[in-house]
A protein has these predicted regions:
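Conserved N-proximal alpha/beta basic substrate-recognition cap immediately N-terminal to
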Residues: 1-39, 47-49, 55
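Conserved anion/nucleotide-ligand pocket segment
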Residues: 45-66
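CheY-like receiver
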Residues: 39-40, 73
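Internal nucleotide-binding/catalytic subdomain
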Residues: 61-182
Length: 182
């Protein structure tokens, strides 16, 4: 089950909701409810974030400014399997504007240790523009992290995540990756 937190965005979102871990507003769509996706997109503000539910080598996220293009891309992802089986289910998510960073937490399922944070550079273009790649690089330490922000991350995200893993008997030992927006 712990692997599903990484392998399925829908499972991860449900986990976050169960443990009151902050996450963007979202809804999941498949070929069975794709007709309802248009109404959800209309109430969202652009840009529209479409995420393949499964693993897609870091390339399964589309950020689209135009409503019609978002509708078309969603259908391409689900019906045409743009990202293979990974996009048979797509999470439409509220766009969060800010700086993306990565948190790595070592855990034995009961205790944890946070490793240094890193600032990701995923985009193919100069100045972090263009499509996502499988990973262009990351820089650590992150200069904009202060003790107040680190405390919020620990109290609102890390502790509830480790608590949830333990409470749901996931028996996980290893690294928990947490992607954040500041």
């Amino acid at each position: 089950l712990a692997g599903q937190l990484e392998g399925s965005k829908e499972v991860a979102k449900q986990f976050m909701e169960r443990y009151n871990i902050p996450t963007a507003k979202h809804e999941t769509f498949t070929k069975d409810n794709i007709d309802q996706s248009d109404a959800f997109l209309v109430i969202m503000n652009p840009p529209y974030v479409l995420k393949a539910d499964g693993l897609a080598a870091g390339k399964g996220v589309l950020i689209i400014d135009n409503l019609q293009n978002a509708k078309d891309e969603l259908r391409s992802m689900i019906l045409d399997k743009k990202f293979g089986d990974s996009s048979s289910k797509v999470v439409i998510e509220e766009f969060l504007d800010g700086i993306e960073l990565s948190c790595f937490v070592l855990t034995d399922g009961n205790n944890y240790k946070t490793l240094p944070f890193a600032k990701d550079y995923k985009k193919i273009g100069e100045g972090d523009t263009g499509l996502n790649t499988g990973g262009m690089g990351a820089i650590s330490p992150v200069h904009f992290l202060d003790n107040k922000f680190l405390g919020k991350i620990e109290d609102r995200i890390i502790k509830p995540t480790i608590h949830g893993i333990k409470k749901e008997n996931m028996e996980y030992m290893g690294v928990v990756f947490i992607g954040l927006i500041k």
